[in-house]
Amino acid sequence: MAELMLAESEREQIRNRCEVVLRQNWREGVRARDGFAFGYTCPSPSRYPWQWYWDSCFQAIAWRRYDPDRAERELRSLLGAQRDDGFIGHTIFWNQPLTGSRRYVYNVISPTDPTTASIQPPLLAWAWGIVIGEPSAEPGLVRHHEWLAEHRDLEGDGLIWIVSPDESGLDASSQFDGIWRHEAHGLPGYLRLVRRNRRLGFDLRPIARAGGPVCCEVVTNVLYNLSRLAMGQPSLTPALIARTYDEARGVFLPSSHPSPRGTPATTIAALAPLALPDLPAEIGRRLVEEHLLDPAQFWTPVPPPSVSAADPSFSVRDRGLFGQRRYWRGPAWINTAWLCWLGLVRLGYESEAAELAQRLGATVAGAGLREYYEPRTGAGMGALDFSWSSLVMDMLDPDLRGAAVSHLVS
């Protein structure tokens, strides 16, 4: 552990770099149709120019230590993109409509739409509670949760379902190999999936009636549940355990219609329930001790990889030989590491939480704020100056008491 400890000067350099990246990625303007003044952090200026739902939530949580006003504005801008019925899209284009090939591969009904017709993991109310205050007092968040319950709860147990791998935020994760198969990986299968969902309006029930696939995905529901808890709504943790917990393997796995083919991969989604404040301790300890802290699986030099290093699907390549998307099939990401870190703190694994923070801090010090990292070497991968990777500072908090932790353990 001693050799992992970052000097205070290194922490300060990381802190300063996080602030520089957040500030340089900040965008603001006025919506042309109604004069709404928006402000958001683009994930990375070179690759991701728009506002992404879950990115904005993570970025607002990171912003709160540097500029609370921008943290709040980020979330209010996301809510400002809401439709009248409560829907909030995966991507908001803010006066920059889709062009070129993106018109065909993005989840939109029409290329002139102001947002995608797809969702992302709905953690806005949770982030709102961390950054701004009581989310249940905001009518737009109430409408958002009403929309999710009405349109995405397929089976009446409160859990929500997705119609595309991208709606999970985990894109081509190997947890979807037995569900969407080649349609999750890239062209041409992914184009077929987009066209099929577009014909059905990205509407869950017609898609399910047509044979799907549709999926009850773990990360999506963990973050949705955290938002529900922040709203004062009943917990979905019992329903999530009943539907997705594989007691024999000691991990959480996606449920789908049709049922997945083959043995589901063990991915970072399997550990995401660690972030839930009411996850039974015995389940949490199994996730930590049998999986997260196992060097052969998730406790790699830069932990945790997005797929268990012991899983046959583990790969650290950005792309496959034919352009398949691979970046959620092995590389380590800061946002999912942060969710695991929250669980370690909540369950009392403070030395392991500190070690995770130190390893990731050292990685960021060496490679910068990248989209994701090679979990064995720490090499930076993907986009440069990636905004949500500034969450590393929440893990480097010397007292292990970020605002998100206090919401989980108090």
Placement of each model-derived feature along the sequence:
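Hydrophobic/aromatic-rich effector regions of fungal transcription factors
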Residues: 105-133, 339-343
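Hydrophobic core segments within long, regular secondary-structure runs in both alpha-
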Residues: 11-19, 23, 68-79, 125, ...
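Extended glycan-interaction surfaces of carbohydrate-active proteins
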Residues: 3-51, 75-114, 157-215, 239-331, ...
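Alpha-helical support elements that line or immediately flank enzyme active sites
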Residues: 56-85, 228, 269-280, 337-350, ...
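Long, repeat-rich segments with strong aromatic
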Residues: 213-239, 278, 322-352
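Conserved structured core elements
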Residues: 50-53, 68-72, 118, 122, ...
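Aromatic- and glycine-enriched pocket-lining scaffold segments that form the walls
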Residues: 139-152, 160-165, 204-205, 213-235
